[in-house]
């Protein structure tokens, strides 16, 4: 029985990248408001190390607000073709400006412009308003690198629980739960 859920996650992700043709790094991100209202949305995983799981967002978005107010999150990866899922719970912290700048520089130019143009999660009166904002920002940065907006950054979810689920016939699923206790991972199997 492995005692390193990060290694197990990497192995499962490698298999998912071979089996899943569309977005094997797609994950459901669950956050909650201060009033405990949950909200779930799909995101893309952009990095994973033993320190945690990284994704990027606009701090003005609902998820940005919720993670700043209530800095915990749950991630769920579901790989249908493999009949597997991984659920991760942990604290969410902002990544460094250097990390955010480095990732932002790798994004497609249109995505960089969109980060400046989007007032994410706020009402949009008409699509052409957004397209005009993109055109204006494109003109502003014509011939120049697009810098990262100060409100666009990443979060790292540092897990304290990681559950690996394998689908089995007749709903006799296999579940292994890893829990971080005093800096060490402990694992146990759970009934389906």
UniProtKB/Swiss-Prot annotation:
<feature type="binding site">
    <location>
        <position position="63"/>
    </location>
    <ligand>
        <name>FMN</name>
    </ligand>
</feature>
<feature type="binding site">
    <location>
        <position position="107"/>
    </location>
    <ligand>
        <name>substrate</name>
    </ligand>
</feature>
<feature type="binding site">
    <location>
        <begin position="41"/>
        <end position="46"/>
    </location>
    <ligand>
        <name>FMN</name>
    </ligand>
</feature>
<comment type="pathway">
    <text>Cofactor metabolism; pyridoxal 5'-phosphate salvage; pyridoxal 5'-phosphate from pyridoxine 5'-phosphate: step 1/1.</text>
</comment>
<keyword id="KW-0285">Flavoprotein</keyword>
<dbReference type="InterPro" id="IPR019576">
    <property type="entry name" value="Pyridoxamine_oxidase_dimer_C"/>
</dbReference>
<dbReference type="InterPro" id="IPR011576">
    <property type="entry name" value="Pyridox_Oxase_N"/>
</dbReference>
<feature type="binding site">
    <location>
        <position position="85"/>
    </location>
    <ligand>
        <name>FMN</name>
    </ligand>
</feature>
<dbReference type="InterPro" id="IPR000659">
    <property type="entry name" value="Pyridox_Oxase"/>
</dbReference>
<comment type="function">
    <text>Catalyzes the oxidation of either pyridoxine 5'-phosphate (PNP) or pyridoxamine 5'-phosphate (PMP) into pyridoxal 5'-phosphate (PLP).</text>
</comment>
<dbReference type="GO" id="GO:0008615">
    <property type="term" value="P:pyridoxine biosynthetic process"/>
</dbReference>
<feature type="binding site">
    <location>
        <begin position="120"/>
        <end position="121"/>
    </location>
    <ligand>
        <name>FMN</name>
    </ligand>
</feature>
<keyword id="KW-0560">Oxidoreductase</keyword>
<feature type="binding site">
    <location>
        <begin position="171"/>
        <end position="173"/>
    </location>
    <ligand>
        <name>substrate</name>
    </ligand>
</feature>
<keyword id="KW-0664">Pyridoxine biosynthesis</keyword>
<feature type="binding site">
    <location>
        <position position="46"/>
    </location>
    <ligand>
        <name>substrate</name>
    </ligand>
</feature>
<protein>
    <recommendedName>
        <fullName>Pyridoxine/pyridoxamine 5'-phosphate oxidase</fullName>
        <ecNumber>1.4.3.5</ecNumber>
    </recommendedName>
</protein>
<dbReference type="InterPro" id="IPR019740">
    <property type="entry name" value="Pyridox_Oxase_CS"/>
</dbReference>
<comment type="subunit">
    <text>Homodimer.</text>
</comment>
<keyword id="KW-0288">FMN</keyword>
<dbReference type="Pfam" id="PF01243">
    <property type="entry name" value="PNPOx_N"/>
</dbReference>
<dbReference type="GO" id="GO:0010181">
    <property type="term" value="F:FMN binding"/>
</dbReference>
<dbReference type="GO" id="GO:0004733">
    <property type="term" value="F:pyridoxamine phosphate oxidase activity"/>
</dbReference>
<feature type="binding site">
    <location>
        <position position="175"/>
    </location>
    <ligand>
        <name>FMN</name>
    </ligand>
</feature>
<feature type="binding site">
    <location>
        <position position="165"/>
    </location>
    <ligand>
        <name>FMN</name>
    </ligand>
</feature>
<feature type="binding site">
    <location>
        <position position="103"/>
    </location>
    <ligand>
        <name>substrate</name>
    </ligand>
</feature>
<comment type="similarity">
    <text>Belongs to the pyridoxamine 5'-phosphate oxidase family.</text>
</comment>
<feature type="binding site">
    <location>
        <begin position="56"/>
        <end position="57"/>
    </location>
    <ligand>
        <name>FMN</name>
    </ligand>
</feature>
<feature type="binding site">
    <location>
        <position position="111"/>
    </location>
    <ligand>
        <name>substrate</name>
    </ligand>
</feature>
<dbReference type="InterPro" id="IPR012349">
    <property type="entry name" value="Split_barrel_FMN-bd"/>
</dbReference>
<feature type="binding site">
    <location>
        <position position="62"/>
    </location>
    <ligand>
        <name>FMN</name>
    </ligand>
</feature>
<comment type="pathway">
    <text>Cofactor metabolism; pyridoxal 5'-phosphate salvage; pyridoxal 5'-phosphate from pyridoxamine 5'-phosphate: step 1/1.</text>
</comment>
<dbReference type="Pfam" id="PF10590">
    <property type="entry name" value="PNP_phzG_C"/>
</dbReference>
């Amino acid at each position: 029985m492995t005692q390193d859920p990060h290694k197990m996650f990497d192995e499962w992700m490698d298999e998912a990248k071979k089996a899943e043709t569309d977005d094997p790094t797609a994950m459901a991100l669950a956050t909650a408001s201060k009033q405990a209202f949950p909200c779930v949305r799909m995101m893309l995983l952009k990095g994973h190390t033993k320190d945690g799981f990284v994704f990027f967002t606009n701090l003005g978005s609902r998820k940005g607000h919720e993670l700043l107010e209530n800095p915990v999150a749950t991630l769920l990866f579901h790989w249908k073709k493999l009949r597997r899922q991984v659920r991760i719970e942990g604290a969410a912290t902002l990544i460094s400006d250097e990390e955010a700048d480095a990732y932002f520089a790798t994004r497609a130019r249109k995505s960089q412009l969109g980060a400046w143009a989007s007032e994410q999660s706020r009402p949009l009166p008409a699509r052409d308003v957004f397209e005009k904002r993109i055109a204006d920002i494109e003109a502003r940065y014509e011939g120049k690198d697009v810098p990262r907006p100060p409100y666009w950054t990443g979060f790292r979810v540092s897990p304290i629980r990681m559950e690996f689920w394998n689908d089995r016939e007749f709903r006799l699923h296999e579940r292994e739960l890893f829990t971080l206790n005093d800096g060490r991972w402990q694992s146990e199997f759970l009934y389906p």
